[in-house]
């Protein structure tokens, strides 16, 4: 069934990527932005899984794992840290966090890099392999699906730049609010380490998947 409906899934996945990306570009709510970006990334590993190639399936699983690390960290940043301190989720009310929360800004930056699929993160490995699998099956839709890389970089850079930089800190924050607590720091650091560690050395994940994925492809063919 996955072979018979592959191209339908491809079309649905590409439409989802484009629609979610444009929706993300227009939102000003930080949690909505992260949620819409999650939909776009989910569509990427959907079409990677339906590419019925070893690279595509391995990449989709790796991207799903990476997405779990990065999105969890970003939601903690948005809801567990920023919202708790300001009681607002609107990006337009944030600016200058680097001045009063430098440690948070660094951890948030690394997670933002992961969300945009920057090299040396597990997200890059997953996206590259997923899209490579799509290119092998249908190059035209592979090109359209690759626009997710451009869009994710655009809305992630906008979000980070608007929140962390942008002049003096917002009136919604006080200068003495303090940086991240020890609990918040440990939670974010775990996600950052996993994202970067497996981005630099993804072999434990990919080698562990290779036999099962190869067996699956062999049975399908």
Curated annotation (Swiss-Prot):
Name by which UniProt lists this protein: NADH-ubiquinone oxidoreductase chain 4
Record GO biological process: ATP synthesis coupled electron transport; electron transport coupled proton transport
The family this protein is said to belong to: Belongs to the complex I subunit 4 family.
Pfam families for this protein: Proton_antipo_M
Reaction catalyzed: a ubiquinone + NADH + 5 H(+)(in) = a ubiquinol + NAD(+) + 4 H(+)(out)
Keywords: Electron transport, Membrane, Mitochondrion, NAD, Respiratory chain, Translocase, Transmembrane, Transmembrane helix, Transport, Ubiquinone
Topology in membrane: Multi-pass membrane protein
Top-rank taxon, per record: Eukaryota
EC number: 7.1.1.2
GO molecular function annotations of the record: NADH dehydrogenase (ubiquinone) activity; ubiquinone binding
GO cellular component entries: mitochondrial membrane
Primary subcellular site in the record, as a coarse category: mitochondrion
Compartment(s): Mitochondrion membrane
Native source organism of the sequence: Emericella nidulans
Record-annotated membrane-spanning stretches: 5-25, 34-54, 61-81, 100-120, 140-160, 185-205
Enzyme class, broadest EC rank: translocase
Function of the molecule: Core subunit of the mitochondrial membrane respiratory chain NADH dehydrogenase (Complex I) that is believed to belong to the minimal assembly required for catalysis. Complex I functions in the transfer of electrons from NADH to the respiratory chain. The immediate electron acceptor for the enzyme is believed to be ubiquinone.
InterPro entries, per database record: NADH_UbQ_OxRdtase (IPR003918), ND/Mrp_TM (IPR001750)
